[in-house]
Amino acid sequence: GMPLEHHSSSVSVEVVGAGAESSTIRLNHCNAITLGGSTIVFEPELYGSFSPEFTLSDLGKDAADGGVYIAITASYDRLIPVGYPDPNEIPLRHPHLLPEIRITAVPVQSGNEHFLNKDFVIIGKGLLEGHGFVLDDEYIPPVQRLAYSQKLRTSLNSTIVHLNHMEDCIGQIYQKNVDDSRRSTLTSNVFTLCRAIDEYYAHQFFQIENILIEEPPIRYLQSINILARSIFNALRTIPNKEYEYMLQYFYEWTEISPSSFETTVGDVLSLKYNHLDIAKTDRVIQRLVTTLDAIIKKMSELDYIGLIRENIIISDDSNTEQER
């Protein structure tokens, strides 16, 4: 769910204790929704002295060796009395009842997406590191919408920045090269790449900028998969030798090797979405947009496509690199 008031994240956990087996996972706050539609809300102000905790010794070191998913559940058949008793009421009693919230750990090797069909929510991941247990800061818990994850919001904003920058740079590439007398086959092939990105931008950018934030993470991958597929299909129309020359040309100016470029595009096309491993999806997406942006940016900075990068001379005066 969305972060509660006065919190920047929907959920917060911490690890207390020094040793691996003596470490305790403690829930600080959360606002989550299970697939069944049940809400799990925990705030210390609501629950008073009750604090959901789980000690790793209950799981066993061997089970935790491969890492664990941290999960929470709300037991509506086990209620916690909360609130301040009315001194005028006899017998004294707490005025409210809230469901007991429990936190537990599931070995990663035992976890799969079937766990998401139960009435609990995975909120984090932990790893044994040295003699202690640490939270995986890179892990992105399953969320219903990108808006519910700070990491995914940041990733989407980064993608939007890269796409906008590429669109500006593509305009510069066209301006410099479309009427240039030095226009070559290489120029036309770079235009092919630019058009693939351009067409994707025209058809997808409104959705990315305005709608995707309210969509599940798989829609994010779907959108970037369309970009990768557009590029892959466009580049297939270039004869092999010309295609290889273009990738080598990119390599000369950006140090992005042909194999790295092809792997980056291929990783997006082949990735199978895993709701328990959203961080992998995010890494693959960011690698593609940053790689494309670096190439397009450099091509836009050249006087014309086809300019050859000759030997680099190191200036004795300034230690800066200059093209001959």
Feature locations, PLM:
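N-terminal "first-domain core" detector
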Residues: 1-40
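Ordered hydrophobic segments in well-structured contexts
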Residues: 29-31, 68-73, 121-125
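Hydrophobic-cavity lipid-handling domains and compact docking modules
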Residues: 37-58
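Short helix/loop capping segments that flank catalytic or ligand/cofactor-binding pockets
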Residues: 42, 81-82, 135-137
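"Short basic amphipathic alpha-helical interaction patches in structured regions
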Residues: 44-47, 82-98
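Elongated alpha-helical scaffolds
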Residues: 51-86
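Mixed-charge (acidic/basic) macromolecular-recognition segments
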Residues: 90-225
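Extended, amphipathic alpha-helical scaffolds
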Residues: 211-324
